C-alpha cells in the first residue's frame, strides 16, 4: 500500500458539510484505509483576480493508505467532486469541494492531467499547515525537504487560520489529526 495525502477545500454553501462528506467518501474507498485527518483551516482564496464576494475556503488534508493507482485515484476524486456538485467548468473559482492528490508515496508523475507531487503545494500554507499536522517529516521527493521545512520556507502571505470551534464529524468522530485506530 502507498501513503497518499489528499488536500480538500470548500468555499461554497455549507463548507463544513461539504468537507465532511468528502472525507467520509474518502474513508470508504475500497482497497484503502484512512490514516489521519487534519484540523480544518480557514483560508482566503488564492488567485490573481479575487472576487470580493468569494468566500473563504475551509481546507484540510487526509492521509490514506491505498492500493488504488494514481490515475484511478484521480478519477475517483473527480467522481466525488461531481457527487458533491462541483462545477466542472469552474476550475479556479468558488467551489463546493476541491480534491487534490498532494503526494502519492514517493512517486513523481508528470502526465497530461496528472502531476504528483502537486506542483504548487510547496508554495501554499493552506496545504502545508494541515499536512504538517499529519506528517511534518514527510519529504518532498523532488525538493528533498520535509513538510516542516517547506512550511518554514513558504512565502505565501495569504491568511490561514485554524477554524474554531472545530466541528464534530461523521468519519469516526475524529475532527483532528490522530493516530489510526488500534495504533
Description of each model-found segment:
Residues 1-6:
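Extreme N-terminal starter segment of soluble prokaryotic enzymes
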Residues 7, 63-65, 104:
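Short hydrophobic/aromatic beta-strand micro-patches
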Residues 8-12, 46-48:
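A short secondary-structure junction motif
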Residues 11, 37, 130:
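Residue-level signal for inorganic ion chemistry
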Residues 14-16:
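Short N-terminal binding/cap micro-motifs at the start of the first secondary-structure element
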Residues 18-19, 143:
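Residues at alpha-helix caps and immediate loop-helix transition turns in enzyme cores, especially N-
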Residues 21, 26-69:
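Short, surface-exposed acidic-centric catalytic microdomains
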Residues 46-57, 68-74, 79-183:
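Flexible, gly/pro- and Lys/Arg-enriched active-site loops
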Amino acid at each position: 500500500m502507498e501513503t497518499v495525502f489528499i488536500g480538500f477545500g470548500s468555499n461554497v454553501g455549507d463548507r463544513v458539510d461539504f468537507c465532511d462528506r468528502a472525507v467520509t467518501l474518502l474513508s470508504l474507498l475500497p482497497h484503502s484505509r484512512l490514516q489521519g485527518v487534519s484540523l480544518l483551516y480557514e483560508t482566503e482564496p488564492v488567485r490573481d483576480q479575487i472576487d470580493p464576494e468569494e468566500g473563504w475556503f475551509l481546507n484540510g488534508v487526509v492521509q490514506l493508505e491505498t492500493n488504488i493507482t494514481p490515475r484511478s485515484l484521480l478519477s475517483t476524486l473527480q467522481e466525488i467532486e461531481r457527487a458533491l456538485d462541483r462545477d466542472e467548468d469552474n476550475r479556479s473559482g468558488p467551489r463546493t469541494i476541491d480534491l487534490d492528490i498532494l503526494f502519492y508515496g514517493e512517486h513523481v508523475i508528470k502526465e497530461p492531467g496528472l502531476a504528483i507531487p502537486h506542483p504548487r503545494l510547496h508554495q501554499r500554507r493552506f496545504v502545508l499547515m494541515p499536512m504538517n499536522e499529519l506528517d511534518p517529516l514527510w519529504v518532498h521527493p523532488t525538493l528533498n525537504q520535509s513538510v516542516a521545512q517547506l512550511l518554514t520556507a513558504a512565502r505565501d502571505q495569504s491568511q490561514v487560520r485554524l477554524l474554531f470551534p472545530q466541528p464534530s464529524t461523521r468519519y469516526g468522530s475524529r475532527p483532528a489529526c490522530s493516530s489510526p485506530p488500534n495504533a
